[in-house]
Amino acid sequence: ILSTGGSDAARSALSCGKKIISAGPANPTFIVDETADIEKAAYCIHKGASFDHNITCISEKNVVVVQDILPKFKEALERLNVYYVDSIGEMLKLSKILLNEDLEVNRLYGGKSADTILKDAGILTDRSYDLIAVETVRIHPFVTKELLAPLIAIVKARDFECALQIAIEAEQGCHHTAGIHSSNSERLRRAAKEFETAIFVKNGCSLDGIGICGVGSTSFTIANITGEGAVTAKDLVRKRRCVCVETLRSYA
């Protein structure tokens, strides 16, 4: 049985007594540190987070940015058709429609366009946008919940150490997808090791991690629960081994 759909689906599948390949919850979080190529980082994050209105489980949901480069990162996003929210008023308007009274996600907006969300929130714009970025705090539901909508949470961090701590906390141990934009090889290595996610992307877009833009076969199912990672045809077929021991040559 191939199970997708989060924790509840995984629990049901795992109790059925058959072989299971199970995907689980996700909250993909990416870091942008002060050594990153800011323009490239913004481009990659926009590309991944705006893909299919951010309804895929691997698309960037949160971005933790070192504070020294946040102004330049914001400008880079705004040049890429991203509506950037850094006012409490607009954040509250978005929270009102995207979250229910109990602060759980309003699933009615899953997969809706950024323009629809902005319009329903009462935020007037003079152009069309394909992604919303909201600067907020690490404990806001936009950070801790997977919205499955074209909105990413931007969290400011004092330095790389702080960014790594916030990002791991935001990913919540799902071990699904994460990434980092940095030119520091030690930070690239360390982040990959500490996240322990099935998909980890260094200096690229989340889509690079599943073969759409990068290398390898394409997979939209990430089995972070049972450990297969990016599921391919090889995980779904019967495996056979054929062995020829002796040579076929004749030594007459």
What is the predicted function of each stretch?
Residues I1-A13:
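Glycine-rich phosphate-binding loop
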Residues I1-L2, A26, V66, I117, ...:
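Buried hydrophobic positions in well-ordered alpha/beta secondary-structure cores of metabolic enzymes
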Residues L2, I31, V64, I152-I154, ...:
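Structural motif
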Residues T4, A23, V66, K202-N203:
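Generic beta-sheet signal
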Residues G5, A36, D68, R158-D159, ...:
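Short beta->alpha linker loops
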Residues S7, I69, S206:
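Flexible, active-site-proximal loop/turn residues at the rims of small-molecule/cofactor binding pockets
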Residues A10-R138:
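ALDH superfamily catalytic-core signature
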Residues G122-A252:
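Conserved C-terminal structural/oligomerization subdomain of aldehyde/semialdehyde dehydrogenase
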